[in-house]
Amino acid sequence: NLKSNLKISIIEPSDKSLYQAAWTLVGAGAYDKNSTIKPMSEVMPSYVNWIKSYAETFLPEQNTVKTSDGDYTYDYLIVCPGLKLNFDGVEGLKESLGKNNVCTNYSAEMATYTWECLKQLVGGTLLFTEPPMPIKCAGAPQKIAYLAADHLKKKGKLNDSNLEFLCAKPVIFGVPHFQGPLNEICDSYGIKRSFQHNLISVDGQSKEAVFKQSDKDGNT
């Protein structure tokens, strides 16, 4: 039970609540895209004050948050910043997405295109990429690799496919406890791993991807 004198405000500009964690499953045809999207008004608690605005500046000495439509004071502040996608960070990626079998699961609409591509697969080369941190959900790029491999296996096309996971990190996952099991999963599906490979450009029409490879000291 909340104390009657407790006032909670949530600064959130979005009209929709997006369950982004499920977009990997949408990309694998295992989840409905529409089930990942709800009006923000339906998930916002009724007992809070919803400030539909962007937080722009913190003034901790003044216990104040500046937003796009005014200033708000507080006694306690909990900051939950997100990440903004930057498809322009890879040359040619923005222009290539959604066609010529160039996909991403970091968008609900694009995740449905991932599934359209997977459904039509009969083999070939599949590249799964993970950029440098920070990114949303470091496991997402490899989860779709496993799901795609399993889909190909069920279709009897895994042996006709060349799957490769190219990761900007020097290891498959940042938590050592999981590195062994994840590498075993890759081995079971025949997924090749290439670490310290960062995607820098895409040409969807010619189906070419260029990566920058670095050593443990960051030299390219």
Predicted regions span which residues?
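Beta1-alpha1 glycine-rich phosphate/pyrophosphate-binding loop at the start
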Residues: 1-49, 132-176
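Short amphipathic alpha-helices and their capping/turn segments at secondary-structure boundaries
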Residues: 2-4, 66-71, 217-218
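Short, hinge-like loop/turn segments at secondary-structure boundaries
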Residues: 25-29, 96, 181-182
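Amphipathic coiled-coil/heptad-repeat helices and related helical stalk/stem segments
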Residues: 36, 110-114, 178
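Amphipathic alpha-helical segments that form well-ordered structural scaffolds
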Residues: 39, 113, 147, 181-185
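Short, conserved catalytic or adaptor-binding loops enriched in Gly and charged residues
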Residues: 40-45, 93-97, 184-187
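A Rossmann-like FAD-binding core segment of flavoenzymes
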Residues: 48-57, 62-65, 150-220
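FAD-binding core/adjacent interface of flavoenzyme oxidoreductases
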Residues: 49-143, 150-156
